[in-house]
Amino acid sequence: MMMVHSMSRDMMNRESPDKGLDSGKYVRYTPEQVEALERVYTECPKPSSLRRQQLIRECPILSNIEPKQIKVWFQNRRCREKQRKEAARLQTVNRKLNAMNKLLMEENDRLQKQVSNLVYENGHMKHQLHTASGTTTDNSCESVVVSGQQHQQQNPNPQHQQRDANNPAGLLSIAEEALAEFLSKATGTAVDWVQMIGMKPGPDSIGIVAISRNCSGIAARACGLVSLEPMKVAEILKDRPSWLRDCRSVDTLSVIPAGNGGTIELIYTQMYAPTTLAAARDFWTLRYSTCLEDGSYVVCERSLTSATGGPTGPPSSNFVRAEMKPSGFLIRPCDGGGSILHIVDHVDLDAWSVPEVMRPLYESSKILAQKMTVAALRHVRQIAQETSGEVQYGGGRQPAVLRTFSQRLCRGFNDAVNGFVDDGWSPMGSDGAEDVTVMINLSPGKFGGSQYGNSFLPSFGSGVLCAKASMLLQNVPPAVLVRFLREHRSEWADYGVDAYAAASLRASPFAVPCARAGGFPSNQVILPLAQTVEHEESLEVVRLEGHAYSPEDMGLARDMYLLQLCSGVDENVVGGCAQLVFAPIDESFADDAPLLPSGFRIIPLEQKSTPNGASANRTLDLASALEGSTRQAGEADPNGCNFRSVLTIAFQFTFDNHSRDSVASMARQYVRSIVGSIQRVALAIAPRPGSNISPISVPTSPEALTLVRWISRSYSLHTGADLFGSDSQTSGDTLLHQLWNHSDAILCCSLKTNASPVFTFANQTGLDMLETTLVALQDIMLDKTLDEPGRKALCSEFPKIMQQGYAHLPAGVCASSMGRMVSYEQATVWKVLEDDESNHCLAFMFVNWSFV
């Protein structure tokens, strides 16, 4: 940008920060001087005083300008640059708002038409009811039949059988009909659309999302703004496997140019089944791409059936043929760049072919909206923001590489869940129980996802083994369960099994022959890699700290790493699937690293009612919840809270020919132990009878009563004050309840000189502050909770604590188990003494804490 060659006297007086300058003096810069200053500005927009003096010495043409005037020039230049960027940003926001306003006006017109249709139908229904009331029952029945016949005559089905749909002209006729039906759904009133809860339009929102009501099959519709050109959007969305995680493959079997400049494609699509309880689906469709007269680009698609005519699709022995009704996407260019995108998905998944308990999964427009329609819109927005540079990831990884990792994790997990024969999977003999299915694959190079090739396995004929199971969960929010599995891995995972899985990446892959039950617990550190724009999915690396307690355990002593994908942790998303998928990786973390994914997927099936004000975002106190739970299996929920979800578990391991049976036995036992752990977690999460959110039970074991007595007595002994004030009681149960419900966070940590202090007990407020449970509390170390100033303050006061018995720490900041920062006004630390006056532990009381 060229600067203005002269500045007025008033502007100089107004901009100059130096009151000592002559108010009648101003500087006229020559083009050469401006060029020299611009060169320096490009290298360093804010030069120091020494740099400005050096500039004057190096550039004789600036010798007649005072250093303070050059300082003012750089200030003005930075100001103009900031104004230019702000103006560009405001123009972008203004274009978004104008486009959104146009979109809302069109949506308003569509809704007005829909209201008019409903008013007309209401009047017509009233007329029919009035007419029917004046006739006999038999005549009214006959009138209904006649009315239905008249309606069918007014809306005759097109007679596709009269045309030859096996030639280009016949296919073009089908394509034009599909286009008309799709446009009537995307911008018209062909479907009764109802806006999804929580999906509100705005310049930064995902867009307008609606689902169908009372239509054949299930349907979803979305429209929003994307900052990409229409042809680029079409290119992205046509590549369905890149954004639809349930899409296994898309094969274009024929491409036929249409006479109007469009293109007709015959496409065979295979979809993954989301669980082990139902067969996968496939589609045989015609896809039509063309430009409209207004400059919009449209891609519509529909199934070819015996009713529509057309070529017969490939046979599907392992799939159930589903029907795609006219669907697609309409892309309209925006003034000033970008596009307005309309997406419609309308399918019939043949729900009657699945077990009754699973039918809600195939009959839910909400689930379709989240898995397909919203996923497509989010993917395009993600690409747009990555292209514009709005999204940047650390670690030097390109966004496309990180997206590929996420796709490979999901694809590998889907391959394991489905176990297709053409991928090389075959069932393995059962051990007598049918709760866990084990399949083996001796040719993993066949996998369509190529998440690992033949080089991944040794040349002596090794393979991949998968143990999987599905179970129904009652009243367990998927988001809460996935968050728990992610944050508290030590409560369900076996360190020995993790070590065995990680061993497949090393030079001697089977150095750990078998996992031992109850492997050593390990601390996990979660390192974030990337997060999608809407924060619905996150990619991260998990470091599992290794331990070795004896010489034979040296194989377990090294740290292990997992590449992990977590999604669906937002409890407010309706119909969302929650998933936690991970795979062992080595320290190099290469872009083409082989991945063998395992994990969990929880899909909501239905929700008959939601308890008022219920929130599952509460502490999952497994120990006390299981101890205090008295509900019998199958007991009805008096609150009417009755929603179900299906959990799918799949774990993959490598094996050689000599260890196949032992690995299979280990995998079965491991999956069964995980199922047992999840059942315990589910009991703690599910609402209790009698209240919407029942309070967590206070642990009432003799050890807990003794510890509380020691904590209270030691506090009084050291400080001379009562921990509970004037309301203090001496009975054990009352004292326990007072400590448990204390308003300040009270925590105990171990007092050992040869190991890092870990927390051993906390009251309810302490658990809330650390965002953990009594069981998981023992995995949290004190030094990882306190920040650096807090650790220094504790170290400086530690001699005083040991001598005097207590000390006060100043206000500071600590971290919860989820990484959230917590501020507190003061912390009191005191020694907890046993009855014989020996040291038992340290107690901490954090006063007036809050999340930052």
Curated annotation (Swiss-Prot):
The keyword Ligase does not apply. Residues 164-392 form the START domain. Keywords: Coiled coil, Differentiation, DNA-binding, Homeobox, Nucleus, Transcription, Transcription regulation. Residues 130-148 have a biased composition (Polar residues). Residues 80-122 form a coiled coil. InterPro entries: HD, HD-Zip_III, Homeodomain-like_sf, MEKHLA, START-like_dom_sf, START_lipid-bd_dom. Residues 1-25, 130-166 are annotated as: Disordered. The keyword Ribosomal protein does not apply. Transmembrane segments: none annotated. Inhibited by ZPR3. Homodimer. Heterodimer with ZPR3. Interacts with ESR1 and ESR2. Interacts with ZPR3. Probable transcription factor involved in the determination of adaxial-abaxial polarity in ovule primordium. Specifies adaxial leaf fates. Belongs to the HD-ZIP homeobox family. Class III subfamily. This is Homeobox-leucine zipper protein ATHB-14.
